[in-house]
Amino acid sequence: MATLFDQAKLMARELQDSDEFKQLSTALAKVRADQEANSAFHDFQVAQKEIQELQSKGEEPKPEQIQRWQTTAQKAQQLKPIKDLSVVEQNLNNMLGEVNEIITAPLNELYLNN
């Protein structure tokens, strides 16, 4: 019988073969091919990472950091390649959420039944 880790590796390969993953790959390639979208996407990622790193240390971001993040997010969301990427990311996240519910169902049952 395969181990849990073997099954996880199989699931990772299945994820890569899924339509959602392929759509994400295509959408991301379109963002990278569009200079304006790629630049805006990069700026957003940098601003978001900066805030996440502060929060992971238990620190609050400064108002100007939050403003920069919001500004870059608004700029990015106005660009079609990034809008399209966001939709595809949401679809993939929905699928992963459903998979997570299936995987963790025994844990939920354990806690609810005891």
UniProtKB/Swiss-Prot annotation:
It holds the Pfam family Com_YlbF. It comes from the Bacteria. Belongs to the UPF0342 family. Transmembrane segments: none annotated. InterPro entries: Com_YlbF, YheA/YmcA-like_dom_sf. This is UPF0342 protein OEOE_0901. HAMAP family: UPF0342 (MF_01526).
